[in-house]
Design a protein with these regions (language model features):
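Juxtamembrane boundary at the C-terminal end of a transmembrane helix
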Residues: 293-300
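Terminal, compositionally biased non-globular sequences in eukaryotic proteins
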Residues: 12, 285-286, 293
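Channel- or pocket-lining gating/hinge segments that regulate access to a cavity or pore
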Residues: 170-286
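Bacterial N-terminal signal peptides
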Residues: 1-8
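A residue-level signal for conserved active-site and pocket-lining positions in enzyme catalytic cores
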Residues: 8-10, 255
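Soluble non-transmembrane domains of integral membrane proteins
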Residues: 12-170, 174
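Short, functionally important structural connectors and interaction interfaces within domains
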Residues: 2, 30-33, 93-98, 195, ...
């Protein structure tokens, strides 16, 4: 009789334990990142350095030893606050990113900081963005770049084991090149060369061939110097398309110079006048139109 009473009690206890196990919720980790500075952004290598405060709060114990920094490494960690429910660390890190150079040199990039739990998957621990403790210092300056936005969100990432994913807190900061410095540094020298070359069409002497040949070589050298600042990519950048139009313009002017020289040797003044007239009618409008169409693509 005693055994009959004990069995229902044991069964009820086992069922209750199983129910508790099935309803176990993952550990909630509130994470906030406040960036105090960025530096050494190298587009060619896709690397940058950063200093930021990492603030963690959770009902269960969590420390910096439980956190993995993705796509980078921590170079120094200083503990600011260390209480059971709240951790605050000042971290210096070297990070990497994948630059998008389609619009180079009017390119913009995202500087990401991503963290995840080293050992617990998303069924055991999940991140929640602590918006009150997330931000960017207003005095942060990255020479040659302008900050124009930031975001923070949580996502899950699956690694080699497709049945297991990890919660990841992602903080992104968007930068773009300063427009005025880009125009002065990249395009002003090229535009001066193009203007001089187009103005040479007004010259009716054969001496313009030497001028345009020099302008063509100067454009090649400037292009080589500018393009050397970025890695090799498998697509045409804005600068590449700009230089294609530039080479086409300079090439047409050089060809007209060669034709003019050949006609001058043949003493065919009528044909020289015709070549000069049609060169002025076709080359400048075509060149300006192509440049305008190219710059309009930046608005898309």
């Amino acid at each position: 009789m005693t055994m009959l009473v004990t069995l229902p009690v044991l069964a009820e206890t086992a069922y209750g334990s199983l129910q508790v196990q099935n309803t176990t919720q993952p550990e909630i980790i509130h994470a906030g990142i406040f960036v105090s500075g960025f530096g050494n952004f190298n587009v060619e290598q896709g690397s940058f350095s950063t200093n930021f405060f990492l603030i963690l709060s959770s009902d269960t114990p969590v420390t910096i030893d439980d956190i993995q920094l993705m796509y980078g490494r921590m170079t120094s960690v200083e503990t600011i606050v260390d209480t059971p429910g709240l951790k605050n660390y000042l971290i210096s890190a070297e990070m990497t990113t994948t630059p998008d150079l389609h619009r180079y040199p009017f390119d913009s990039h995202t500087l990401p900081i991503q963290i995840k739990h080293k050992h617990k998957n998303d069924k055991q621990a999940v991140f929640v963005i602590d918006t009150a403790r997330t931000g960017l210092d207003k005095e942060t300056v990255l020479p040659g770049w302008e900050f124009y936005g930031s975001s923070a969100y949580v996502t899950n990432k699956t690694f080699l084991n497709a049945s297991e994913s990890y919660s990841r807190a992602v903080f992104t900061y968007n930068v773009q090149r300063d427009t005025l410095s880009t125009l002065l540094k990249f395009f002003l020298p090229i535009l001066i060369i193009v203007i001089i070359s187009l103005c040479s069409l007004l010259m009716k002497t054969s001496s313009r061939l030497g001028v345009n040949a020099s302008m063509f070589l100067a454009a090649v050298m400037i292009h080589w110097r500018i393009a050397d600042a970025i890695p090799l990519v498998g697509y045409a950048t804005f600068l590449d398309e700009f230089m294609i139009i530039t080479y086409a313009t300079l090439g047409m002017v050089v060809v007209t110079g060669i034709v003019t020289l050949m006609l001058a040797e043949a003493k065919d003044t009528a044909q020289i006048e015709r070549v000069n007239r049609w060169s002025l009618r076709i080359i400048p409008p075509l060149s300006i139109g192509l440049y305008c169409l190219l710059f309009l693509t930046l608005l898309v």
